[in-house]
Amino acid sequence: MDAVAFEDVAVNFTQEEWALLGPSQKNLYRYVMQETIRNLDCIRMIWEEQNTEDQYKNPRRNLRCHMVERFSESKDSSQCGETFSLIRDSIVNNSICPGEDPCQSAECEEVIMGHLSLNSHIRVDSGHKPHEYQEYGEKPHTHKQRGKAFSYHHSFQSRGRPHTGKKRYECKECGKTFSSRRNLRRHMVVQGGNRPYKCKLCGKAFFWPSLLRMHERTHTGEKPYECKQCSKAFPFYSSYRRHERMHTGEKPYECKQCSKALPDSSSYIRHERTHTGEKPYTCKQCGKAFSVSSSLRRHETTHSAEKPYECKQCGKTFHHLGSFQIHMKRHTGDRPHKCKICGKGFDRPSLVRYHERIHTGEKPYECKQCGKTLSHSSSFRRHMIMHTGGGPHKCKICGKAFVYPSVCQRHEKSHSGEKPYECKQCGKALSHSSSFRRHMVMHTGDGPNKCKVCGKAFVYPSVCQRHEKTHWRETI
C-alpha cells in the first residue's frame, strides 16, 4: 500500500521512444502530464489496495488508452495499435468496486474500466478541457462546509464525504469506524504492524515506500521544492504549500464554531479538536491520550530512560532534539521570532503566536460551563479548576491535585526523596533541574549572560535582564 506520488502517475519515455512520437502525440503527452501535476494535490491521499509487488500481476492495475490514434495529425496515420499506460489504477480504483461492469466510450468504442476513467477518456476524445485551478481558470465545485473550491467534481465528492459525520466503514479487529474505505484500508495496515520498507541508513521501517522516500530526504538533505518568492527550499511538497500560503495569506479552511481561518486541512482538524476535546491517539503503556500523533510520539519516548541530548552548560538532558534546541536558546539569549506588531522577540514561534493574541484580542478557548473565553490553553486549564475544584493530575501518595503532570511529578519526588540530578564536580544530588542549575553556578562562578553595567554573570538571559533593571532603578 502506497501513497500516490508523482513518480507513481508519471509517464516516462526513453529518448528513442520520444523520437518516434509525432508533434500532436507530444502535445497530448504534455497536456496529460500538466493535468496530472495540477491534480496531484487532490489525489495524493488515495491509497493503493495492494502491495507494490502485486501491481503488475493484476490486469486491472493499468488503465490503457489509445489517445495517440485520436490525436494524430493525419487521419490516415491512425490505427497504430500503440497503447500508453497513463495513470495507474491506484487513482481510478477509488471509483471501481468489485464486480463493476466495464464502461464503453460512445465516441470511439474503447472499453474502459470505471466511470471515472470513462469520463476522463471522453473529455480527451472530444477535445473538451476540464476545469482548471484558480490561477488557470474557474473552479466550479465548491465545498459547502469549508468553502474550498475544486476543479473536478470527483475531487469535490471525495473531499465532501468526511464532513457528513457518517462513518460507515468499521474495523473488525478493534471496532473503530471510518468515513471512507481508503481510511479503513490505511488503518488495517497500521493495525497489522507490518513495516516492510526499511531505511538503509538508519534502519527505521515504514508502512509505505513513499514514506520511506520522504524519510530518506532527512539523511540526504534533499529539498526539491523551492519557493519562487523567497528561494527557501523544502524537502516535502506539503511543507512547501504551507509556506507558500504565508506569502499569499490564503486560508481556505474556516472553523464553524469560532470562524478562525486556517491554511491547510491538517491545521483545521487539529484546531477542531480544541473545541471538541477529541484525543484519538492513546499511549499503550500509560493510557494517556493526545490530540495529535506527534505529541504521542514525543510522549512515548519519555517511557524510555534514554536522553541523548545533553546541555554542556548546565548538564540537563533531553529526549528530543527540538527541546534541546529550545533550551540552548535560553542560554544564548537568541530570540529570532519577532512580533510583527511590537517587535518583541521570542525563542519559539508558538510563543509569538500566544503573544500576538494580546494585540489582536483573540480568545479561542471557551468554557462550556460559564461561557468565558480565554486566550491561552494554560489560562483555560486554570479556569476549569474553579469549576472542578482541582486539577486532573493527582499525587498518588497524598492526593494533592495539580493542573500539569510535570508539576505533579515534581511534587511526588518530594515524597520519594528521588534526586536524579547529580553534580559531576562534587557529587551532590538535587531533586529538580532548576536547583541543579543554580548549584552549578556556584562551581563555575560564571554564566553566559553578563550584566552590561556591572559584569555580573547569570545562567539565564531573563534573570540577567531582571538584574539590569535594578541598575536602571538606581539611576532614577
Swiss-Prot record:
May be involved in transcriptional regulation. It holds the Pfam family KRAB. Gene3D superfamilies: 6.10.140.140, Classic Zinc Finger. GO terms for biological process: positive regulation of transcription by RNA polymerase II; regulation of transcription by RNA polymerase II. Keywords: DNA-binding, Metal-binding, Nucleus, Repeat, Transcription, Transcription regulation, Zinc, Zinc-finger. This is Zinc finger protein 563. PANTHER family: C2H2-TYPE DOMAIN-CONTAINING PROTEIN (PTHR19818:SF161), ZINC FINGER PROTEIN ZIC AND GLI (PTHR19818). Belongs to the krueppel C2H2-type zinc-finger protein family. It is found in: Nucleus. The keyword Nucleus applies.
